[in-house]
Curated annotation (Swiss-Prot):
SUPFAM superfamilies: Metallo-dependent phosphatases. The gene is Pp4-19C. Mn(2+) 1 binds at D54, H56, D82. The modification Leucine methyl ester is found at L307. Protein phosphatase that regulates many processes such as microtubule organization at centrosomes. The probable PP4 complex Pp4-19C-PPP4R2r-flfl (PPP4C-PPP4R2-PPP4R3) is required to prevent caspase-induced cell death (in vitro). GO terms for cellular component: centrosome; chromosome, centromeric region; cytoplasm; nucleus; protein phosphatase 4 complex. The active site is at H115. Its EC number is 3.1.3.16. This is Serine/threonine-protein phosphatase 4 catalytic subunit. GO terms for molecular function: metal ion binding; protein serine/threonine phosphatase activity. Pfam families: Metallophos. Binds 2 manganese ions per subunit.
Length: 307
């Protein structure tokens, strides 16, 4: 796009937590689709890069993240999904990230989380929020269509595998991820579902997930996968960590959580992972944006769903 003035104006508007017009959302999603369709299921990302976990519509905390981590395009970012649901500002959060993607496609990578799904967003807030803010379901439809185009995973310098949830018993090789047809709603089971839903667990082999989707996977599964694919570690999100990040299995799996004071009541801190060009790791810990800097909606937009 030769003229970025409209897009830059929309980005500024979204940064003030103001929604853009429905027809602007439609056009933005059309442009985003053109970019995302070219990305692979295992999207290649070059260091240096800052890796982020779940955001969940906590817009003012996303602003805090950029405050401590630096802005796009000065910094290169990878977000590991779950942009929407549960927080008060899923619309502004997702549209800001999407607008940044369209404006600076090589400086921000967005991969899909289990909440980037039609079914899940109808239960956990994004659908209702779109309806409330736009008076129709059109914006929800445009956004959920884009969800289908998001990459399923990313690999940094060929060495750090990034995925929202975890591993799948159906996948031994990265090439098996590359051959998935991702342009669909998240299935209830199978490899695509597992990548977005699974969790590491102190055990050997595979276990039944209490989430009802995906699997629990043990340290032996990880060492086999990492060895087979010649990678150093797996970086993922998907689980609340009170300290913002958590190592598993002798530093072969890392959970990063980037939504501070999750659901505005969990009291956790958040983290982002800064990787330099040598893949040296630096964790930046941050707290929720101060109360006075955030507009809290006058009434709660949704019921207290279980965490």
């Amino acid at each position: 796009m030769s003229d970025y003035s409209d897009l830059d104006r929309q980005i500024e508007q979204l940064k003030r937590c103001e929604i853009i017009k429905e027809n602007e959302v439609k056009a933005l999603c059309a442009k985003a689709r053109e970019i995302l369709v070219e990305e692979g299921n295992v999207q290649r990302v070059d260091s240096p890069v800052t890796v982020c976990g779940d955001i969940h519509g906590q817009f003012y905390d996303l602003k805090e993240l950029f405050k401590v981590g630096g802005d796009v395009p000065e910094k290169n970012y990878l977000f590991m999904g779950d942009f929407v649901d549960r927080g008060y500002y899923s619309v502004e959060t997702f549209l800001l990230l999407l607008a940044l993607k369209v404006r600076y496609p090589d400086r921000i990578t967005l991969i899909r989380g289990n909440h980037e799904s039609r079914q899940i967003t109808q239960v956990y807030g994004f659908y209702d929020e779109c309806l409330r803010k736009y008076g129709s379901t059109a914006v929800w439809r445009y956004c959920t269509e884009i969800f289908d185009y998001l990459s399923l995973s990313a690999i940094i310098d060929g060495k750090i595998f990034c995925v929202h949830g975890g591993l799948s018993p159906s996948i031994q090789y990265l090439d098996q991820i590359r051959s998935i047809d991702r342009k669909q709603e998240v299935p209830h089971d199978g490899p695509m579902c597992d990548l977005l839903w699974s969790d590491p667990e102190d055990q050997t082999g595979w276990g039944v997930s209490p989430r009802g989707a995906g699997y629990l996977f043990g340290s032996d599964v990880v060492s086999q996968f990492n060895r087979t694919n010649d990678i150093d570690m797996i970086c993922r999100a998907h689980q609340l960590v009170m300290e913002g990040f958590k190592w598993h299995f002798n530093e072969t799996v890392l959970t990063v959580w980037s939504a501070p004071n999750y659901c505005y009541r969990c009291g956790n801190v958040a983290a982002i992972l800064e990787l330099n060009e040598y893949l040296h790791r630096d964790f930046v810990i941050f707290e929720a944006a101060p109360q006075e800097s955030r507009g809290i909606p006058s009434k709660k937009p949704q019921a207290d769903y279980f965490l």
